[in-house]
Amino acid sequence: IAEQYNVILLHENEKDIFGDIARRCNVILNEVGSEHFKAIFDFANFVQCDEDPQACYKLLTPHIEYIHIKDAVYEDSVNVLCGTGDGQIESILKQAIDRGYEGFLTLEPHLVVFDSLKDLELEHSTETIQNTVAKDGAEGYKMQYEALLKILSNIEQEENA
């Protein structure tokens, strides 16, 4: 159906599903085997599944159509400001840009607990989100946006050096 209507369906490496780790994402993507079925790459979800985002990126590169900007730390799986965790965001984004990535970057400001997120998280959302980073969702979004701009600026400066 996706091919018939020329749309692209996306699989996200969401925690606690079969396709949460890179190896299983790759199985799903290769089994479907369609140019109309691609991957969303979410740095934090890989970290929270104890995966190495760089290894995940290397395996899934041919399938990545969309990138979620969200970071986390291995130690306790807590979401942190993008670029400050173990997601290797700047390094991997640079690689994506260098290979010609022109897709979307979606900010996921999961720095505070909000009602709709509670409904999405299978585990208790306060285990991965600490309300100490931002006072509310608007501030969390602004912080993530500014952190992403800094990451992109660093990449641009490195390219121009």
Regions found by a protein language model. Name each.
Residues V7-F18, F41:
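Aromatic-lined carbohydrate-recognition surfaces of secreted/lumenal glycan-active proteins
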Residues I21-F41, V47-A161:
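Histidine-acidic metal/acid-base catalytic patches
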